[in-house]
Design a protein with these regions (language model features):
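Conserved small-residue-rich beta-alpha loop and adjacent elements
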Residues: 1-35
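General beta-strand structural signal in soluble alpha/beta enzymes
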Residues: 11, 44-46, 65-67, 88-91, ...
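Short gly/pro/ser/thr-enriched loop/turn and capping motifs at secondary-structure boundaries
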Residues: 16-20, 70-73, 95-99, 258, ...
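ALDH superfamily catalytic-core signature
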Residues: 23, 27-34, 62, 70-211, ...
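Conserved C-terminal structural/oligomerization subdomain of aldehyde/semialdehyde dehydrogenase
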Residues: 36-39, 60, 118, 134-136, ...
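A structured beta-alpha segment of the ubiquitous adenosine-cofactor-binding alpha/beta core
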Residues: 42-64
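Short acidic-hydrophobic, aromatic-tinged amphipathic segments that line or gate anion-handling sites
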Residues: 43-47, 100, 226-231
Length: 285
């Protein structure tokens, strides 16, 4: 979009896949030449701290960032500290809540369980849109859904993540969940070998979510998700209102869930960049 607007672009390559980044840059440069665009309209640089220097540089007039909440906040502060502050367009960490309404649970509990595990383990759970929080109303189909969810997780194979630091951060996130006195591990996937991440399913208490417990709002990058059971419609709406900003929010519903789904939609639109209906956020481009 920057190139389409007539702006030259400087990309800071990710240290986890520098060779892939270089191949991508070479392809873009070839396209620039073929299209007859000015030389230097696209640039790629490498380095650990060079991103901060880019944000400070007076020639840079806007910044796009994808990454952690802490990293995005740090770059935002740098952008605002410039003599002439510049905008930062950030796609930061999210837990992407997925809500399952009663009729959907009763109608397709097993299918939802299988599809949901496939979604939050896709690519080792490293999609920014991975559904990290599952909200389900207590109803007749809930126990069937939980049983199927646990069984699917138990059969899930461990995966190799992007690099060693990513795996280390995943394990740190898992350790933090395990240390929380009110979070329970519901299911574990097949045991992980050295350098692998095990699939995990946890359950937290709705009271902690309503109290905006920081840990329950923190993304754990990897193949896990957190289930929270909600008592009633009023409590579900309160939980949605208590959420921080999200990349996506997903709603699973059937015809009989229509009135509740309709009342949730404006709340979800306030919280998420994209709202999905009867789908999975890892399919969002």
């Amino acid at each position: 979009s920057a190139l389409a607007a007539g702006c030259p672009v400087v990309v800071k390559a990710h240290p986890g896949h520098m060779a892939t980044a270089e191949l991508t840059a070479e392809a873009i440069v070839r396209a620039v030449v073929r299209c007859g665009l000015p030389g230097g309209v696209f640039n790629m640089i490498f380095g650990t701290d060079i991103g901060a220097e880019l944000v400070r540089h007076p020639a840079i007039q806007a910044v796009g960032f994808t990454g952690s909440l802490a990293g995005g906040k740090a770059l935002y502060q740098l952008a605002q500290q410039r003599p002439q502050p510049i905008p930062l367009f950030a796609e930061m960490s999210a837990i992407n809540p997925l809500i399952i309404l009663p009729q959907a649970l009763q109608t397709r509990a097993e299918a939802l369980a299988n599809e949901l595990v496939a979604s939050f383990t896709l690519g080792g759970g490293q999609f920014c849109t991975r559904p990290g929080l599952i909200l389900a109303l207590r109803c007749a189909g809930l126990e069937r859904f939980k049983s199927a969810l646990c069984a699917t997780v138990a059969g899930s194979t461990p995966q190799v993540l992007l690099n060693a630091p990513t795996l280390q951060h995943y394990r740190q996130g898992v350790a933090a969940l395990a240390a929380h006195p009110r979070i329970e591990k519901l299911a574990s996937g097949i045991a992980a070998g050295a350098g692998q991440a095990q699939t995990l399913l946890w359950q937290a208490q709705v009271e902690d979510l309503l109290a905006q417990d920081t840990l329950l709002q923190t993304e754990v990058f990897g193949p896990l998700s957190l289930l929270v059971e909600v008592d009633d419609e009023a409590q579900l709406k309160a939980v949605v209102k208590a959420q921080q900003g999200q990349l996506t929010a997903t709603l699973h519903a059937e015809a009989d869930d229509g009135p509740l789904a309709a009342s949730l939609l404006p709340l979800l639109c306030e919280k998420a960049g994209r709202v999905l209906f009867n789908g999975y956020p890892t399919g969002v481009e």
